[in-house]
Amino acid sequence: PLIAQFSDEDLVVGGGVAIFHIASQRVVICSAPDRRGEKYYFLPKGRRDAGEDSRTGAEREGYEESGYRNRLLPLPTKHRQPQAHPRVDSPPLTAEPVWMQMMPLGYGSKQYVLYWYIAETLPPGLEVELETEVGAAYKPPPAYPHSLTLRDRVKMEPEGYEPLHHEGTGVDEEEATYESHLVSVEEAIKKLGRTGVMADVVLKGWKEIQHRFAME
């Protein structure tokens, strides 16, 4: 833990997501060429828009950079956030961040604070409801229903269903070069780097998904 202060003009807040297709036990990762032309892999992330909720911003960035619509997934993760008043009991499932990064931004004194969330691809019915034209404003999905179990969620997809991938969702020239891949958890960890934060996010997310299955 550290103590630091940043004025509004030096602080940037963002969010990222590990997007899981639970039925096939796969996760979305992105790739792009580095300065030497070699491919590197990453999870979708980015700055939230002014006035935007951090969770919505993470879902939106996940969609824009990967092309997969997604929604945050409530999981039995441990956290230290207080419950809303009146505090009758603690809900066993929350969609709180599973990781936080602090990184310098550029070469100045600006600080980037990034929150990592766990999300899922959307069921076919929601994809139809949220369908928009290329270049249209982002349409956020409804939250994951509190009463929907993971097993019932999986049953909402026909056997062998492939999550819908949208083309042209990047909002700038750099994002237009991104490619997305739906890969196994093991492959994602290998490509993201076993000691990197993004690999940790995937590991944490998959562990908590299995924990929720066990609870149900």
List PLM regions with ranges:
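A conserved hydrophobic position in a structured secondary element of the catalytic/binding core
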Residues: 20, 43, 183
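Short, P/G- and charge-enriched loop/turn segments at secondary-structure junctions
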Residues: 1-7, 94-107, 166-169
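Conserved beta-strand and immediately adjacent loop positions that scaffold enzyme active sites
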Residues: 16, 26, 179
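Acidic pyrophosphate-coordinating catalytic loop
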Residues: 79-113, 124-125
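Nudix hydrolase/Nudix homology domain
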Residues: 36-40, 110, 114-116, 120-216
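Conserved Nudix-box catalytic region and its N-terminal flanking loop in Nudix hydrolases
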Residues: 23-87
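Acidic, metal-coordinating catalytic segment for phosphate/diphosphate chemistry
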Residues: 1-16, 20
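Active-site beta-strand termini and strand-to-loop segments that position acidic
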Residues: 19-23, 32, 119-121
